[in-house]
Structure formats: structure tokens, C-alpha cells
Amino acid sequence: MKRKPFNVGPVTLRSMPFWCVGNPLADPFGSKVLESIPSVQTAEIICESANEGLIEATSFHDDDLVPWNPENLEDDLEKNSDTMQTLCEIKEMLNSAGVSVNTATCSLHGNPIFRNGGVTNPDPKIREIARKKVERTIRIGNFLGAKYFTYWVARDGFEVPVAVDWENVYKWLADGLNSVYDYIKRKKFTNYIGGTIEPKPNEPRGHMFIPTSGHAVGFILGKLKNPNFWGVYPELLQHESMALMNAVHTLGYLISMNKLSFLHFGSQIKAQFDNDFPPLIGPEGLKETVQMFWLLEKLGWKGVVEFDCHMLRCEANPKEPIQSRKIFIKNCVTALSICLELSSRIKKVNNVEKITESEIDLSAIMKMCAVDEKKIASCSVNS
């Protein structure tokens, strides 16, 4: 089955990843709120949401789908292994529901073996294990038909600057990402249309080696041997807001460089830890979020919007772990539809008619909120 694209405004597909749906909502201060569910059950929830017309795609970390054993790095190649049986079941479910796979991501953050980094680990033996895990993820992505292989910075970062091997760390990172391209070409995997990088300023490490979208583009163009293969997927509002940057600026820059692959979507309080709030949820960010979609429409960009967030920990119901997850998906989709509707209202703002930038901004706000500008003008004059 092939599902009809969403194709509303700049959004071609709505993707809800396994890690968002399966999240049991543990945090550094407390244990999980919801019971963990197996990946097949997560796939079932995703497929049900697709059948309800809420989403068209999904994504995964390798560890979201199947366990990883560093003593058996090629279990996915064993036809009768538990790993392959689980992957076959998930593939059949996704195909039956017409859910495409946007991206395959290798988890290089969960296992303590990667506590000092994955592809940038100073220990060459750990870097080799990371490379093998990446190759396994690429194979799983090929099996499920993923369009992108993505690298997010995970634990490739530092806390102590003087402890970093600065002469080699970016070479190791380039070697790791170049090997992704080489492996895909060597295996003749045709499902992948590119690789992508997700930057993040900090967390889980104190500083990350690729902290912003600008760093990511510079690294791609300056260090990778096949820069046309690679793009960037920013997590907005979250990651850029952590560094007090503006999401509209980020998207404008990436589009100008032809490096915006797709978009990770959620909400964030600026300068805090990675909140990963659902879109539009929380005390701030409405204007910035809506203007993101205004910009995408204005510049003619079209692509996948992928949710990367989790439900608020306080609203998870331990007695209804499945229903809580379904409500979360619906809320994310509703928020996206709100953004698209509000952004469509401000695309008619005519900058030429306004004298100042403040007037342009106020006019855009009134249009976004469907406020009668003439009524506001009359109320502003004390007669």
C-alpha cells in the first residue's frame, strides 16, 4: 500500500518516529512514567495513526527497533535471528499501512560503551565498534526503505577542552561520516537519497562538536568528500533555541545553502535544557514557530516535517499507556495544522505598504490572529 502524501503548504509528509511514541518519559530526576512497550507495539500505534489519516511516515534509531549486542555486530544478517524476525514483522506492518520510513539513525548515545563518544571516541577500538553499529543501522534502514541516514551528535562532544585531541577529533568525525557514504555505495543501496546531520549545542555532553546548523554546513562543505550527499535537519524550536538563535534565521540560511533536508519539529523555552515539548506547547514560541512555516512557503521549500518531542511527563497516564501515546500523536498533528493555518494568513502581508519594520510586524500579528486592522486602528485613537 502506498499512502497519499499530505501536501499541505510546504509539508509533503508528516513523520512520527518510533522514539517519540515509545518514550516512557523517564528523566534525570525520576523513573519512567509509562511502561515501556516493545517495538512491534510501537509500530502498531504508528500504523493506527496513519490509518486515521494523522501521519504518513516514521523514523527510527536502531535501538528503538531491536536490541544491540556489541558481541554480535551482524545479527541482522542472520535470517532466523530474533532481530531479523522483529524487523520483518515491523516491515510488514508499515508496508500494510503505507507508512514510509524517512530516516534511519544509529544510536551512539544509549550504551555506556559510547560514554566518551562514538565516531569521535579517542579509543580507536570504540570508533571501530561505532562504525560497525552504523553499518548495521544502514542495513536496517535499507531493509525498511529509509530515505536518509542521519547522524545526530549524540555523545560526540566534551566537557574539558584541554582533554580533547583537537588535532584529530574532526578528522575522526569526517572519517566516520565519509564511511557512511562509502558503505552505502559499496553495498549499492538505492533507497538512500542522502545523509543528514542534526546539530545540537549541548546535552548530553557539555559541548557538542557540531553545535549549530552553521557548524554543520561548514563541516559538510569543508571536511566531507561528498558534500552533495549531505544535508542538515535542524530541530526547531529546540536545539537552536537552546543557543538563543532564531528558527526562521536557521531555515533561511539552510535553504540559501541548499542544505535543508527535512525538519525536526517541537517546542522549547529559550536557553533551557532540551525541553522537547510537543509543537506549540509551553509558554513561548508561537510567533517564531508560525513564521517558520511562513518562510518555508515564501521560499518555495517543500519536504518532510518530522516530530521530535515527547508528551509532557505530567500528562502521561500510567493506567492508559497506549491511549496516552495516541493522544500525544493527535496533539502533535493538531499543532502542525494550526501552524500551517496561521502561517497561511500572514503570507499576504505587503511590506511595501508599511513604513517601519514594527508596523510590518504588527500587521503580520494581526493577520495571524485574524484581527480586524481597521477596528484596532479605531480603538487606538482617543476621540
Where would I find each of the regions flagged by the language model?
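Histidine-acidic metal/acid-base catalytic patches
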Residues: 1-54, 73, 139, 147, ...
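Surface-exposed, active-site-proximal loop segments in enzymatic domains
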Residues: 24-31, 65-82, 110-128, 155-168, ...
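Glycine-rich, aromatic-flanked loop segments that form ligand/cofactor-binding clefts
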Residues: 3, 9-18, 44-68, 78, ...
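Catalytic-core regions built around general acid/base machinery
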Residues: 76-98, 173-176, 180-183, 291-295
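An active-site-proximal structural segment forming one wall of the substrate-binding cleft
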Residues: 90-93, 122-149, 169-188
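Active-site-proximal loop/turn and secondary-structure-junction residues that shape catalytic pockets
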Residues: 20-22, 62-66, 105-110, 153-157, ...
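Extended, charge-rich low-complexity interaction segments
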Residues: 100, 132-136, 299-302
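Active-site-proximal loop/short-helix segments
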Residues: 106-117, 146-168, 190-207, 211
